[in-house]
Amino acid sequence: MMSPEEYVNQPRDTKRENDVCKWLRAASEHEKFEFVWRAIRLNPGLGIPLVRTAQLRPVYLEVILEHGFVYGDASTVRLWYEATVSGLGDRKVLQLLSAHLDRAPLIVNKMLYWFRPSDERLLPEVQELKKKFEAKYPNFKSSRSTGIHATGT
């Protein structure tokens, strides 16, 4: 099997991607995560699509989503969210997001834009989080789109 370094340094190829996904599904949990994690760190554009197809355990998906919260910009954070939400569930994503309200407002701000739970019963909780965010950070603005804290005024 190829290494993550080899995988991300080659042009996209559907056959190769399918072979890697087949191997990942048969690999141990740790091997799957290790390969996907290294691929993500080297080239998120090629690594993120592996997240969903590798069928990772929720604990690994949390690590990946938290990384995406911090290192995904205002647009790409959506890719991290979409790659992990089916394995974590909307409620867990909302819990992870809510946990950042006090210390990482930039994460909450950029994710609230994309977060659309498929479970309509969660919509009141999402609205409540939006209200808390707006009350806590009434004039929130940031001159950057990655990291955890706002910059500027």
Regions from the language model: what does each represent?
Residues 5-26, 35-56, 76-88, 107-118:
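Structural detector for internal amphipathic alpha-helices that build alpha-solenoid repeat scaffolds
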Residues 1-15, 73-77, 99-153:
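Long, helix-rich interaction regions
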